[in-house]
Amino acid sequence: MNFLNIFEDHVAGIFGATRAPFSFKKLAKQAARDMEDQTLVINGVNTAPALYTILIAADDDPMLAPFYPELSREVREFVKAQAEKRRYVFVGEPLVRFMIDPQLRAGKFSVFAENVDAPTPVSYTHLTLP
Protein backbone atom coordinates (compact mmCIF):
# COMPACT_ATOMS: atom_id res chain seq x y z
CA MET A 1 0.00 0.00 0.00
CA ASN A 2 1.50 3.37 -0.95
CA PHE A 3 1.77 6.43 1.31
CA LEU A 4 -1.16 8.17 -0.35
CA ASN A 5 -3.51 5.23 0.25
CA ILE A 6 -2.37 4.95 3.86
CA PHE A 7 -2.94 8.69 4.31
CA GLU A 8 -6.39 8.44 2.74
CA ASP A 9 -7.34 5.53 5.03
CA HIS A 10 -6.19 7.42 8.13
CA VAL A 11 -8.10 10.57 7.19
CA ALA A 12 -11.23 8.53 6.41
CA GLY A 13 -10.92 7.09 9.91
CA ILE A 14 -10.81 10.59 11.38
CA PHE A 15 -14.03 11.65 9.70
CA GLY A 16 -15.89 8.36 10.07
CA ALA A 17 -19.37 8.70 8.54
CA THR A 18 -19.06 12.49 8.23
CA ARG A 19 -18.43 13.67 4.68
CA ALA A 20 -15.24 15.71 4.34
CA PRO A 21 -15.66 19.11 2.63
CA PHE A 22 -12.94 18.36 0.06
CA SER A 23 -10.59 15.59 -1.05
CA PHE A 24 -7.78 15.12 1.42
CA LYS A 25 -6.06 12.95 -1.17
CA LYS A 26 -5.83 16.05 -3.38
CA LEU A 27 -4.63 18.05 -0.38
CA ALA A 28 -1.86 15.49 0.27
CA LYS A 29 -0.82 15.53 -3.39
CA GLN A 30 -0.71 19.34 -3.32
CA ALA A 31 1.45 19.28 -0.17
CA ALA A 32 3.85 16.80 -1.81
CA ARG A 33 4.04 18.92 -4.99
CA ASP A 34 4.72 22.07 -3.00
CA MET A 35 7.36 20.24 -0.97
CA GLU A 36 9.05 19.19 -4.20
CA ASP A 37 8.85 22.72 -5.66
CA GLN A 38 10.20 24.40 -2.52
CA THR A 39 13.00 21.93 -1.70
CA LEU A 40 16.38 23.67 -1.69
CA VAL A 41 19.90 22.32 -1.93
CA ILE A 42 21.72 23.64 1.13
CA ASN A 43 25.37 22.63 1.53
CA GLY A 44 24.78 19.78 -0.89
CA VAL A 45 21.73 18.47 0.98
CA ASN A 46 18.18 18.47 -0.40
CA THR A 47 16.33 20.36 2.31
CA ALA A 48 12.53 20.13 2.26
CA PRO A 49 10.32 22.93 3.57
CA ALA A 50 9.24 22.46 7.16
CA LEU A 51 6.18 24.74 7.31
CA TYR A 52 2.95 23.75 5.54
CA THR A 53 0.06 26.20 5.59
CA ILE A 54 -3.32 24.91 4.51
CA LEU A 55 -5.80 27.64 3.68
CA ILE A 56 -9.45 26.70 3.93
CA ALA A 57 -12.75 28.46 3.36
CA ALA A 58 -14.44 30.14 6.32
CA ASP A 59 -17.54 28.03 5.65
CA ASP A 60 -15.52 24.81 6.13
CA ASP A 61 -13.81 25.87 9.36
CA PRO A 62 -16.59 24.97 11.84
CA MET A 63 -16.76 21.41 10.51
CA LEU A 64 -12.98 20.93 10.28
CA ALA A 65 -11.86 22.70 13.47
CA PRO A 66 -12.35 19.70 15.79
CA PHE A 67 -10.19 17.62 13.45
CA TYR A 68 -7.26 20.04 12.98
CA PRO A 69 -4.88 18.30 15.43
CA GLU A 70 -5.40 14.88 13.84
CA LEU A 71 -5.37 16.23 10.28
CA SER A 72 -2.16 18.16 11.00
CA ARG A 73 -0.53 15.00 12.31
CA GLU A 74 -1.60 12.95 9.27
CA VAL A 75 -0.43 15.57 6.76
CA ARG A 76 2.87 15.91 8.66
CA GLU A 77 3.43 12.14 8.62
CA PHE A 78 2.58 11.97 4.91
CA VAL A 79 5.02 14.78 4.07
CA LYS A 80 7.73 13.16 6.20
CA ALA A 81 7.24 9.82 4.41
CA GLN A 82 7.42 11.51 1.01
CA ALA A 83 10.59 13.37 2.01
CA GLU A 84 12.20 10.18 3.32
CA LYS A 85 11.37 8.40 0.06
CA ARG A 86 13.16 11.17 -1.85
CA ARG A 87 16.02 11.35 0.69
CA TYR A 88 15.18 14.92 1.66
CA VAL A 89 15.89 16.31 5.11
CA PHE A 90 14.04 18.92 7.15
CA VAL A 91 15.39 21.76 9.23
CA GLY A 92 13.52 20.91 12.40
CA GLU A 93 10.26 19.01 12.61
CA PRO A 94 7.63 19.75 9.91
CA LEU A 95 4.74 21.89 11.09
CA VAL A 96 1.27 21.88 9.51
CA ARG A 97 -1.15 24.68 10.26
CA PHE A 98 -4.66 25.47 9.08
CA MET A 99 -5.74 29.04 8.38
CA ILE A 100 -8.93 30.58 7.06
CA ASP A 101 -8.86 32.37 3.73
CA PRO A 102 -12.00 34.51 3.41
CA GLN A 103 -11.56 34.53 -0.38
CA LEU A 104 -11.94 30.76 -0.75
CA ARG A 105 -15.31 29.22 -1.55
CA ALA A 106 -16.60 26.29 0.48
CA GLY A 107 -14.93 23.04 -0.52
CA LYS A 108 -11.76 24.74 -1.79
CA PHE A 109 -8.29 24.84 -0.24
CA SER A 110 -4.73 25.94 -0.95
CA VAL A 111 -1.46 24.53 0.35
CA PHE A 112 1.79 26.45 0.72
CA ALA A 113 5.11 24.93 1.75
CA GLU A 114 7.79 27.24 3.11
CA ASN A 115 11.40 26.87 4.15
CA VAL A 116 11.92 28.21 7.65
CA ASP A 117 14.78 28.26 10.11
CA ALA A 118 14.85 25.73 12.91
CA PRO A 119 13.23 26.95 16.11
CA THR A 120 15.68 28.73 18.38
CA PRO A 121 15.26 28.60 22.15
CA VAL A 122 14.31 32.03 23.43
CA SER A 123 14.92 33.32 26.89
CA TYR A 124 12.03 35.64 27.61
CA THR A 125 14.03 37.48 30.27
CA HIS A 126 16.09 38.99 27.44
CA LEU A 127 13.17 40.24 25.37
CA THR A 128 12.58 43.97 25.20
CA LEU A 129 9.01 44.93 24.50
CA PRO A 130 8.18 48.26 22.86
Question: How does the language model describe each region?
Answer:
Residues 125-130:
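Conserved small/polar residues in nucleotide/adenosyl-binding loops
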Residues 1-124:
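Long, compositionally biased regulatory regions of eukaryotic proteins
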